[in-house]
């Protein structure tokens, strides 16, 4: 049948695991950039059910302001370990803005808002849906 029953699209919810050292790096960098936004590239590995984030990269030629942060992705060296980005929101919310979604890079977007603590870190997929985030002490803990 051409126009009848469409197959239902099932998506697997991925869990994001981030090492405590990496989360501490995001917190410290966000506090350093405050009152401007800061942006970092996340390194790690992805499997069917989870994304493990275990490192950070400072993107070359990144720009920062009170309401924006970004980087030219064409200046990045090719690296298959990039799994997404982390950036800070100096005020209000850690929810992704429309601009955040339009400039999405990778598999996960981690957003942290002021006052930059473990409790203000959140992870989102490409559509802005909340992803479960777990901070682990080391990769052996997962």
Model-identified regions with their sequence ranges:
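Conserved, mostly hydrophobic/aromatic
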Residues: 85
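Conserved beta-strand-loop surface patch within small alpha/beta domains used
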Residues: 1-82, 90-142
